[in-house]
Amino acid sequence: MSAGSERGAAATPGGLPAPCASKVELRLSCRHLLDRDPLTKSDPSVALLQQAQGQWVQVGRTEVVRSSLHPVFSKVFTVDYYFEEVQRLRFEVYDTHGPSGFSCQEDDFLGGMECTLGQPAQKWLLQVVMRVSVDVLGPAGHCAKHFLCCTESSHLARTGPSFLLRYDDLCLPWATAGAVRWWTCRGGHTQGWQIVAQKKVTRPLLLKFGRNAGKSTITVIAEDISGNNGYVELSFRARKLDDKDLFSKSDPFLELYRVNDDQGLQLVYRTEVVKNNLNPVWEAFKVSLSSLCSCEETRPLKCLVWDYDSRGKHDFIGEFSTTFEEMQKAFEEGQAQWDCVNPKYKQKRRSYKNSGVVVLADLKFHRVYSFLDYIMGGCQIHFTVAIDFTASNGDPRNSCSLHYINPYQPNEYLKALVSVGEICQDYDSDKRFSALGFGARIPPKYEVSHDFAINFNPEDDECEGIQGVVEAYQNCLPRVQLYGPTNVAPIISKVARVAAAEESTGKASQYYILLILTDGVVTDMADTREAIVRASRLPMSIIIVGVGNADFTDMQVLDGDDGVLRSPRGEPALRDIVQFVPFRELKNASPAALAKCVLAEVPKQVVEYYSHRGLPPRSLGVPAGEASPGCTP
C-alpha cells in the first residue's frame, strides 16, 4: 500500500463551485514502473496535459507517491467535457526529484500515454489507443498482417509492417455508440466483434520513439459527475493510535475508500501525514458526493489508517467500515466515532479491542445547483435591450447607415436583437421586454436623452415579445434625431435599480439581462465602469454587442476576461458580468451560433450570483443557510 506525499491531495481539485460545464473526473494508478533510483524505488507523479491549438499544455499534476513502483494517486483531475470538440489528453509519468506538484528538469521520464475524451452510450470514458489487425493481400497472393493503432495524425504513417492511425479519425459509420469494433480484412471481406466500452482503461506506458517502458502500465478511471448534486466537507481526527515506531511515535495518515460494485476499492482521498502524533487531527477536505459514494448514501466506505514510512513500507494501524448515511446519522447524534481495528490482532488476541479510535470531527453536506435548477425552480429572466441612436450610425434614410431599414434584409441591430432576444424570451413567462434608446434627440422638445423608451411611453417601456421590440425600433427611427454622445451608464444604472429591488426579496425569482447594441466605444467610460462595478453585486448581466466596423479595442476593458474590472476609485467588481462581442466577427454566422456566443457566459453568471448570496432555487424550499449553489449542468 502506498501513501502520498506528506501533504494530502484533494479529490476534487479547485474551489467550489466550478464553472458551468459537463464534468469528468479522472483517477490514476500505475503498475510496474521503471525504477530510476539506484538506492531506493522511484518517487512517481503524473502530469496531465491537454492539447490546445496544436500545443500540449500542462493542466495539472498529481502528488508524489514516495518510493513506489505501483502508485495509486489520490489527486483527482476534473476535466471539462465538450461534445463538439476532440479533446486530446496526455499522461506523463515522472520519477520526481522536485517538490510535490511541480516539475523539475532533473525529473526522470518513466513513460506516457495519449488518448482522447469521449462520450459513448452516455457514459464518460477514455477512447484510447486501439490496435486493429488488417490482413492485406499482396501482389503474389501472399497475405501480410498489419496493425492500425492510435497516433497523433489522421494520415497513415508506415513503420515496418505497421500503419499508425488514430481510432477517432477513422470516422467509421459502423462504429456504434457504447462499443468499439475490431475488424479483420481479407481480400475485401470483413468480419468483426465488439469490445464493450468501459470506464476503466489500462494501457502500457511508452517512452520516446514509441518504445515500451518495460511492463509499465497506467490505469485511468473516468467517471461522469454531471449529475452530481452536491459535495461533502469532512474532517477526521484520531486518538490513542498504536505506536509503530521504536524511537518515536507513529506518523499517521488516513485513506478513505469507496467500495465499488465489483467489491474493489476506489481511493477517494488520502490525508496529509501528521508527524510523531498518536492523537492526530487531519485537515478538513472536500469531495463530491459522486466521488465519495457514487451519489448512493448506502454504498459501503472503508477507512484505513497507516503509519507513514519514507521508504514506502507503511505500517498498517487499523481500519473500519461505514456508509455516508451512517456517518450523517452518527454525526447528528454526536456519536461519530469508530474503533480502528487491525484484523490480525483481533484474530490473535482475545482481549484486543482496537488500535485506536477515529472520530468524524465535522461533516457538512452542500447542495450544488445548476442554471437549469434555477430556471426550473421558477427563476425568470427579464430582458432589456438598449439601442445606440447616436449620429455615428449614419442617417437612417441612407443605405450605408447601420440603422437603414432594408425591406429584404435586416440590419445588424435587428440581427443581434432577434438572435439574442428569441433565446431570452423562452425564459420569461410574460414575454414582455423593456426597450430603451440612448444618444438621440427625442420629441417633443428634441433634447438629448441617454435613457428613453423607444415606444415613447415612459410609464411602460415594455414591448410584447421580440416582434414588439422590432416594431417599436422601426417606428422610433423616423421620430428621433440621431445625436450623441455614446453614454451607457444611465441605462445600466436604470436596470440596476430594478435589479436592486429584486435583490431585497432574498429569493431566486428574477434575473436581469441588459443587451446594449452600440456602434462605437462608450464616451462615459469612467461612469460606465462605476455602474458595472455596482451592478456586479446585483442579479444582473450585461451583454454589449458592437455593430459596424469601428475599433472596439477600448471596449475590451469592460469585459473582465483579462482581469478584474475596477471602478475609477479602485473598487473591484464582485463578479464578471459583462460579455463584449464584436458583431462583425459573427455577421456571417447563423442566428443560433450568434446567440450561443453572445449568451455563453450567462448561465455561469446566474449561478455565481445565487451562489454568492447562498440562495437555492425557489421550488426546492431549502433554507438559504444550507444552500451551496454551484454549477453543474
Swiss-Prot record:
Membrane as UniProt keyword: yes
Expression (tissue specificity): Expressed in the brain, testis, thymus and small intestine.
Domain C2 positions: 2-133, 212-339
UniProt cofactor(s): Ca(2+)
Subcellular location: Cytoplasm; Nucleus; Cell membrane
Annotated ranges, domain VWFA: 382-581
Keyword annotations: Calcium, Cell membrane, Cytoplasm, Membrane, Metal-binding, Nucleus, Repeat
Family: Belongs to the copine family.
Role noted for this protein: Calcium-dependent phospholipid-binding protein that may play a role in calcium-mediated intracellular processes.
Protein name (Swiss-Prot/TrEMBL): Copine-7
Taxonomic source organism: Homo sapiens
Gene: CPNE7
